[in-house]
UniProtKB/Swiss-Prot annotation:
Gene of this entry: rimM
Source species, domain of life: Bacteria
Pfam families: PRC_RimM (PF24986), RimM (PF01782)
Protein name: Ribosome maturation factor RimM
Domain notes: The PRC barrel domain binds ribosomal protein uS19.
UniProt-listed Gene3D superfamilies: PRC-barrel domain, RimM
Amino acid sequence: MPGNSGNDRSVVVGRVSGAFGVRGWVKAVSFTDPPVNLVGYRPWTLRRGDAERRADVLEGREHGNAVIVRLQGVDTREQAEALKGFEVTVRRSQLPPPAPGEYYRVDLVGLKVVNLGETVLGEVVDVMETGANDVLVVQGDRERLLPFVQGVFVKSVNLEESRIVVDWDPGF
């Protein structure tokens, strides 16, 4: 499949931040909007470094700025604490399709970036969140940081062609 929108890719959607209570519930920071959507993605793959394990979500709910979740086979506080720091990943195919003109960051990584004059600036290696707008980290002959502002700097995104066209001077 062209581009990086393959449905077999893992996407980080949260992180286990610790235990909740004494019965094995875990507390997780959700990167989804709204945060409780994290509970609906099943199964999870928990990953920390080279360690990886499947986690079946039995139930969960929002709790303050986080979510609390009961996972199959995690029955004690000690078992839940052992999962602290694990990333929560799901398959890309589990995510709902983005609205028109919106993109998942994971789908932008790997796309070729060219300017209006067809000069290749490089490839998107990361997307940083800065508050005001996301920033594309583009690696070519050097690293460039390009604001992801559609209609201003970003003129088009074509996932099928693995290409982003930007209004950007290659000297910058």
